[in-house]
A protein has these predicted regions:
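Compositionally biased terminal segments of proteins
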Residues: 1-30, 34-120
Length: 120
């Protein structure tokens, strides 16, 4: 796997979500990749995980993510799971695929807005 290429596509997808007028306010970035990016976690995480902040928007978010990811490649696999959508982006033959997972579980979580590499 070309780590730099994978990181590039992760950042492009994150930026596209951040710039989307609705998705940016519906998704909270979480998981190993967010820890790697914001807290310099030493292990390389290869997927993008989000919490959905409004569970009633699950279908809408699924459809919007599907359209958004098609700008970067093809959707190799996708499913609407019990706890939310999972989409797998294939951005090039022979490359590792990028999994995007959204959880619609409702937790008493607290989120903070953070800037990533000057993207705000």
């Amino acid at each position: 796997m070309d780590i730099n290429k994978h990181r590039y596509y992760m950042m492009q997808v994150l930026l596209a979500i951040f710039r989307h007028p609705q998705l940016s306010s519906l998704l909270a970035f979480k998981g190993g990749t967010s820890l790697m990016m914001f807290h310099n976690l030493s292990r390389f995480s290869t997927d993008l995980d989000f919490n959905l902040l409004d569970a009633s928007k699950t279908e809408y978010v699924y459809n919007e993510l599907h359209s958004l990811l098609l700008k970067f490649g093809t959707i190799d696999d996708e499913a609407m799971k019990f706890y939310g959508p999972i989409l797998v982006l294939n951005y090039g033959k022979g490359e590792r695929m990028l999994k995007v997972e959204v959880s619609n579980r409702e937790y008493p979580n607290h989120y903070e807005v953070r800037s990533l590499l000057g993207t705000d």
